Amino acid sequence: MAKRDYYEVLGVSRTASADELKKAYRTKAKELHPDRNADNPQAEAQFKEVNEAYDVLRDADKKAAYDRYGHAAFEGGMGGGARAGGGYGQQGDFASAFSDVFEDLFGDFMGGRGGAPRSRAQRGSDLRYNLRVTLDEAYRGVQKTINVPASVACDACKGTGAEGGAEAVTCPTCSGMGKVRAQQGFFTVERTCPTCNGMGQIVKNPCKVCHGAGRVEKERSLSVNIPAGVETGTRIRLAGEGEAGMRGGPSGDLYIFIEVREHALFQRDGVHLFCRVPVSIAAAALGGEVEVPTIDGGSSRVKIPAGSQTGKQMRLRGKGMPALRGGGAGDMLIELAVETPVNLTARQKELLREFEKLSEDNNPEGKSFFSKVKGFWDGMTG
């Protein structure tokens, strides 16, 4: 079977740039890779065809020979000047081309040429701590002491993992690269070194305290400043208070996530507070004053307008929560709840019945409601 044109295989024009060739190759190779096409028996042959085409067109000399002589340039019939370095059958050149692109596609799985070893010094992991505070503490701000279990640098070996603090030595398996290579079929696979776990170094005489880890588990007490205005979900970062680093690497950070407990009197909405205050029927009808508590521990007297109903809201400006990053404070919203009296005496019941007879014209909302009900039923029967 005649070979297809290499440009056709990659789906590019003959004037395609090196970047366009590489982009086309990456797309085709990713699409046709055998690992992703286990149920397609033709995928492997197409995959090899794509790699063969790119192996030629990525090389300036091979490309020039192909543009001039076509496939004949690599079939052995041309003179030495026409053969530009061999074709698909030369595994070294092909593996080089394959590795260049697949290093981008699969990261550490495919190794490029001249890859660097993993950094020997590793930063420690970040830690999370959930801290609950009261609404009063969130209002004022508070200093809290917390106990955090974490890995810290071993004092016996100064974090090196070696007995007596001796330095680690270069790993003999990977020669300090942290990776080892293996030939699989027509390409090279690069994996993390199993001896040093990618560190590039090993400890000959492990520390007896930390067993070569360079870290030990320990609970630490930390003092944390909780600023005024925090709310549930607020995150506080303590730099360098996370897990200890490896091989002299920096420690991670500790992130404290705040949860504000519910309050018996106040509900919170951002910087605003909400308080439901019960009032008597007499106070709601005649008007008056009610004393309401405030989050700062004090109280404020609030005037109740005559004729107030349940659900009426009044605002105390500046009596809410402080803004976390400055900018004043929110408000406190007071909602009235008109309270129905219970456990009435005979005299109280008598007075209420008399009051009801005298108040037919004093209940506009009820009058309006029953008028609407009458209209509804008239419409149903009419």
Swiss-Prot record:
One of its GO terms (biological process) is chaperone cofactor-dependent protein refolding. Binds 2 Zn(2+) ions per monomer. Zn(2+) 2 binds at residues 171, 174, 193, 196. Keywords: Chaperone, Cytoplasm, DNA replication, Metal-binding, Repeat, Stress response, Zinc, Zinc-finger. A zinc finger (CR-type) spans 141-219. Zn(2+) 1 binds at residues 154, 157, 207, 210. CXXCXGXG motif repeats lie at residues 154-161, 171-178, 193-200, 207-214. It is found in: Cytoplasm. GO terms for cellular component: cytoplasm. Residues 5-70 form the J domain. GO terms for molecular function: ATP binding; heat shock protein binding; unfolded protein binding; zinc ion binding. Pfam families: DnaJ, DnaJ_C, DnaJ_CXXCXGXG. Its cofactor is Zn(2+). Belongs to the DnaJ family. Participates actively in the response to hyperosmotic and heat shock by preventing the aggregation of stress-denatured proteins and by disaggregating proteins, also in an autonomous, DnaK-independent fashion. Unfolded proteins bind initially to DnaJ; upon interaction with the DnaJ-bound protein, DnaK hydrolyzes its bound ATP, resulting in the formation of a stable complex. GrpE releases ADP from DnaK; ATP binding to DnaK triggers the release of the substrate protein, thus completing the reaction cycle. The J domain is necessary and sufficient to stimulate DnaK ATPase activity. Zinc center 1 plays an important role in the autonomous, DnaK-independent chaperone activity of DnaJ. Zinc center 2 is essential for interaction with DnaK and for DnaJ activity. Homodimer. This is Chaperone protein DnaJ.
